[in-house]
Amino acid sequence: KAVLAAKDFNQASQLLKQNLGSMANAQEKAKAYDYVTKLALKTFDAQNAIEAQNVQAKMLKQKITPYDTIAYYQSAYDATVNGLECVKYDAQPNEKGKVKPKFTEALTPSLTNTRMQLVNAGNYYAQRNDQDNVLKYWGMFLDTDDNPLFAKAKEGEKQYLGQVAYYTALYANQAKLYDKAEKYADIAMKD
């Protein structure tokens, strides 16, 4: 209940981590993760709206509004990670042994969108030679590639999936994360 009373993502996320083990069942965990995901989406949506307005402003040669790029990308990551946890718990059986997902359907479009932004986040950090963040964002994108939740987005990802996987494999290799480098190289070779 403390998680659901938190007003911001960081506080709610902290409370969730502290109280996860004491939550009664998977449904309670799913509800908490859904709430934390929605807090991350609130930040993401606010920054996304500014970015969308900026695209239009560029076309009309109007003033561009600055937005918090780092918060935008971090909130996309946070929403994706916590949303996937919500979906995991949402798919578990209740006390009667029945699986009745309550949050997955509503979260899927938002999570598909935030996951796609992980590619842009990786590009942003690649331009700044920030290896850790490239691996964080592109790695999360690739690590969730086989998640059935994102099956409908597969067609749209085909145009850049192999390239993202190739460069992520290079970054992972440079970081001496050979298991990840091999995994990402395998994804790239399927392209």
Per-region residue spans from a language model:
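Residue-level recognition of tetratricopeptide repeat
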Residues: 22-31, 148, 161, 178, ...
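Extended alpha-solenoid helical-repeat scaffolds
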Residues: 163-191
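Start-of-domain marker
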Residues: 1-51
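Conserved structural position within tetratricopeptide repeats
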Residues: 20-21, 88, 143, 186-190
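Short helix-adjacent coil turns
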Residues: 6-11, 129-130, 176
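Short coil/linker segments at helix-helix boundaries
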Residues: 39-132, 136, 140-163, 167, ...
